[in-house]
Amino acid sequence: MKIDKKSLKRIVKVLLNKVPKEEAALIKVSDDLTLIQEIYRKDKDFRNFILNPSAPYEDKKKIIDSLSEKAGLDPVVKEALEYIVKTNKGNLLKIIGDEFRFEVEKFFATVKGEIITAYPIDEETINSVKEVVEKKLGKKVEFDIKQDPSIIGGIIVKAGSYILDSSLKTYLQKLEQQLTAF
């Protein structure tokens, strides 16, 4: 089922207008939407039920009420979920968290990123990478630091649309492609 981008943007805009423009409130709604998105992606039964047009809205609403209560969802998120389900646009749940987070990042002029290394790195290195990326993007960047021994060495930096992969693993893969091309 194709994603209706127009509806997605409209729903995200309504959410942004209903949520107080305070960092804590926006982060709470963003986290709630990300949780819903993850449940939608990982729980096949939930996804199939939400997408089933012949399932009565009242039954879907009961699931939303239960989920909202258990997860402590913000009332604005619950209201948006009910609207999405009522209008049979359940497939929007696949990306609504990403879209909302993108709009919040634009609002705060911040970008979420990640630094991936094979081994632990010190604060000084993190700060220098952060400084370079912020200068390049012209926005504040908040990095999650991850370790992935499979990259062997080097660093991978992702922030918004900016990706720098100087890992040894990627270098070796490119070298292998060049050598086997002959």
Curated annotation (Swiss-Prot):
Isomerase among keywords: no
Topology with respect to the bilayer: Peripheral membrane protein
Source organism, top-level taxon: Bacteria
Location of the protein in the cell: Cell inner membrane
Cellular compartments per GO CC: plasma membrane; proton-transporting ATP synthase complex
Matching Gene3D superfamilies: N-terminal domain of the delta subunit of the F1F0-ATP synthase (1.10.520.20)
Alphabetized InterPro entries for the sequence: ATP_synth_OSCP/delta_N_sf, ATPase_OSCP/dsu
Entries under HAMAP family matching the protein: ATP_synth_delta_bact
Protein role: F(1)F(0) ATP synthase produces ATP from ADP in the presence of a proton or sodium gradient. F-type ATPases consist of two structural domains, F(1) containing the extramembraneous catalytic core and F(0) containing the membrane proton channel, linked together by a central stalk and a peripheral stalk. During catalysis, ATP synthesis in the catalytic domain of F(1) is coupled via a rotary mechanism of the central stalk subunits to proton translocation. This protein is part of the stalk that links CF(0) to CF(1). It either transmits conformational changes from CF(0) to CF(1) or is implicated in proton conduction.
This protein's name: ATP synthase subunit delta
Organism the protein comes from: Persephonella marina (strain DSM 14350 / EX-H1)
